[in-house]
Amino acid sequence: MFTVRVRTMIGLAVLAVTLALGGTAQAMTLAVGSPDLAARIAVTVPVTVTCNPVGSLTVFSQMITVRVEQAAGRAIARGTGTLFAAFPSPLLFPCDGSTQELSVIVLADPAGPPFHGGKAIVSANGSSEAGTPSPFGSGFVAPFDRQDVSVAAVQVKLG
């Protein structure tokens, strides 16, 4: 009987810790679609993002960054594109569990070669931050919620 109570209490304690951590460790998702190359300089990369709800907090900062790299002879063509939004500007995507599609334009680094049709590597990351608006003016105070996601190198075809 004593063993059953101890196991039950330990199980409930683990469940309570899991539920408490679940409120702060949100899962955000990000997927990269098939990119489109224009004029060998711009690559439009479609991304799909899902941000989980943040309760009564206010989302104040969001960012999606996409990197493209491609072998170009003995050099590497590369570029980075970023979408960013900060309160009070409109957000990039809602944090309500719904899926949102966005396009990130990546420009080739002018110090290197241009992109070309063929295989390339795309990686991406995203973040969303939420907090409680400060009662003393601008800014946000605790509690905070931050969701991060990374997409490791994915091979795609530019064309």
Predicted regions and their residues:
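Hydrophobic beta-strand positions in extracellular immunoglobulin-like domains
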Residues: 48-51, 68, 106-108, 126-128
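Surface-exposed loop/edge segments in extracytoplasmic proteins
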Residues: 72-85
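Short glycine/proline/serine/threonine-rich loop/turn segments at secondary-structure transition edges
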Residues: 108-122
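Aromatic sugar-binding surface patches on proteins
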Residues: 43, 94-111
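Short, surface-exposed binding/anchoring microloops in extracellular/periplasmic proteins
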Residues: 28-75
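Secretory targeting and sorting signals
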Residues: 1-27
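Short proline/glycine- and polar residue-rich coil/turn motifs
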Residues: 39, 84-100
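Short beta-strand elements
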Residues: 131-159
